[in-house]
């Protein structure tokens, strides 16, 4: 479970995020929709530890991670994947996944984790040996996630 409670974020004198609360249960998929400048990216950057909130809290699996660094959040299984299809074009899908897991301390479950990725994005399983740069834009975004 992931939860944001009464999140407020400022950029200098600008109150960018005003009291957002959000709860996402395991297995749910949630989309943030809004106009340019509405705070979608700021909310995600704050949730992933890339921006500190002014007030409010961020919770993961019942633990307050508000003051946990972005790197530590990655170790907990949480990360921020911005738009832009940032993949290594000259490497295969599998090589991109392996590179993404390179810094993991627990490397014993990589095969199971890759199988989980492939179950969520079956097209990546079909293209695991294909160069990432030849994937469609949507497929590249799946791989980046």
Labelled PLM ranges:
Residues 33-35:
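The feature captures the beta-strand-to-loop junction immediately N-terminal to the Walker
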Residues 12, 30, 68, 93-112, ...:
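ABC-type ATPase nucleotide-binding domains, specifically the catalytic core motifs of the NBD
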Residues 48:
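Helix-to-loop junction immediately C-terminal to a conserved catalytic motif
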Residues 30-31, 80:
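Short beta-strand immediately N-terminal to the Walker A/P-loop
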Residues 56-63, 76, 109-114:
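Conserved ABC transporter NBD signature motif
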Residues 2-4, 17:
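Conserved structural motif at the start of ABC-family nucleotide-binding domains
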């Amino acid at each position: 479970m992931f939860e944001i409670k009464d999140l407020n974020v400022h950029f200098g004198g600008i109150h960018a995020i005003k009291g957002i609360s959000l709860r996402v249960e395991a297995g749910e998929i949630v989309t943030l929709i809004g106009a340019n400048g509405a705070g979608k990216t700021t909310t995600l950057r704050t949730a992933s530890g890339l921006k500190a909130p002014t007030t409010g809290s961020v919770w993961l699996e019942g633990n307050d991670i508000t003051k946990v660094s972005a790197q530590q959040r990655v170790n907990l299984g949480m990360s921020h994947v911005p738009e832009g299809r940032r993949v290594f074009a000259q490497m295969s899908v599998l090589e991109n996944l392996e590179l993404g897991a390179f810094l993991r301390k627990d490397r014993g479950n990589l095969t199971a984790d890759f199988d989980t990725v492939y179950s969520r994005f079956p097209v990546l399983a079909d293209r695991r040996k294909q160069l990432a740069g030849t994937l469609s834009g949507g497929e590249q975004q799946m791989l980046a996630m």
